[in-house]
Amino acid sequence: MDATELGVSGEGEEIDMEVMRPLIESEDRFEGTYGEKKHLQRYLNSDNKKDEEVMKPLIENEDDSDGTCDEHQYLQRHPDLDNKDGLTFFQTLIHLLKGNIGTGLLGLPLAMKNAGVLLGPISLLFFGIISIHCMNILVRCSHFLCQRYKKANLGYSDTVGLALEVGPGVLQRHASFGRNLVDWFLVVTQLGFCSVYFVFLAENIKQVFEVFLETKLQQSEIGIWSLDLRIYMFSFLPLIIPLVFIRDLKNLSLLSFFANVSMAISLLIVYQYVIRNLSDPRTLPLGTSWKTYPLFFGTAIFAFEGIGVVLPLENRMRDKKDFSKALNIGMAIVTTLYISLATLGYFCFGDQIKGSITLNLPQDSWLYQLVKILYSFGIYVTYAIQYYVPAEIILPAVTSRVQKTRKLLCEFTMRFFLVCLTCAVAVLIPRLDLVISFVGAVSSSTLALILPPLVEIITYHKENLSPWVIMKDVGIAVIGFVGFIAGTYVTIEEMIYPISYVPPNVSHSDFGVLNNTVLEGH
């Protein structure tokens, strides 16, 4: 609000602005120009709950379907009121586990192959510790900015934007860019997840269906045939499209509950199989070449990229002072789960490990075929939840540019386009390991490793950070950046020249013939 909007004459503008200054300034001390303060106050008055609303589907309670928790009332409630109906410690812990366990977990045994039986577990532990530390950094920076500028809560992109806004002068004018950058990487990450789901569903259901078909055809003495993997991807498109038109995800709460149960049962069955069928780890390499390690990095960071749900969870927790404990316990469990399944899976299947460990399970047992069906059901339902995030970021920006009478048509068109886009990416890169590694290297490394330490340096730039903290933050950001560059380069090279991918039962000498028809090996 300026002086002219208040009906003040130009001559008295300076006096009136002095009078009105308390209405537009923060009560806390802020060292900067008056113009900077006005710009900051406009930023603070923006809708900083957008991140929480966008990421909300990833942290919803499964018991919301009973009507005991009205989400709309929660979101409309004044943010400064008591969070009496917030998440308990146990609920927060469960949501942290749910937000970090998905297809990335099943791809870690193959990632272990790209790192080695010794270097792999050590690297996973290292990346796990760094990821947890970066999550805590983001939470601390959010708390600092909230307390200093009297905000109830902040999301990821708002935290980055406000940190830039109150940072050094050269960065202040880039606050909007910082927020948009985080939103863009969130969109890339979530749509990347959705593309991974297409490949995962196609590979697992293809295997189940063709084993079933093979059994029937052998009984009738008819020749065995195999469909291209891309046919299965396209066949899932009409099944997934209806999911993305569901606006209120509470309608999926019951399905989401059964999906989580299905995935948990599947993991238990996978664990018991690999533990009972361990091979001698001394036959496996301790380490691998630098050319395959970036693929490991991308997959590992993809698996650990749960930082997008951290602040929304903390904002909805009933007793926020316990969040750090829940975060550390939850991520410690996740890290243990990752290292154990990755190591045991690689010990069990060795060099024959595939993009998803479920694809290595025996095909002649109904129990292990059921594992693929159950986990695929869980991933199918999860698609709608992951898709919600980029849709809520992209759709408002697009529909705001069209006439009101065409907004609904525009929204439906964009929803249809985005789901087709994720399918197209899966068709173009029909290898589960490469899609996971590419998404991890490009966007997950930025969100999980690069931005949090830089945000800490900017947020506390006036608080006399110790040289050790600055060196630590710069070191983490450099690791993330090197992984970003190397992982992206090696993954793209592998897409063009897939020399490290050898389908099962195919020798390296014969693989040159199949290099251009890799789909037939799935």
Curated annotation (Swiss-Prot):
One of its GO terms (molecular function) is L-alanine transmembrane transporter activity. Glycans are attached at residue 515. It catalyses: L-tryptophan(in) = L-tryptophan(out); L-alanine(in) = L-alanine(out); L-proline(in) = L-proline(out). Pfam families: Aa_trans (PF01490). Coiled coil: none annotated. One of its GO terms (cellular component) is lysosomal membrane. One of its GO terms (biological process) is amino acid transmembrane transport. The chain crosses the membrane at residues 115-135, 181-201, 226-246, 255-275, 293-313, 329-349, 377-397, 409-429, 435-455, 467-487. Uniporter that mediates the transport of neutral amino acids like L-tryptophan, proline and alanine. The transport activity is sodium ions-independent, electroneutral and therefore functions via facilitated diffusion. PANTHER family: AMINO ACID TRANSPORTER (PTHR22950), NEUTRAL AMINO ACID UNIPORTER 4 (PTHR22950:SF190). This is Neutral amino acid uniporter 4. It comes from Xenopus laevis (African clawed frog).
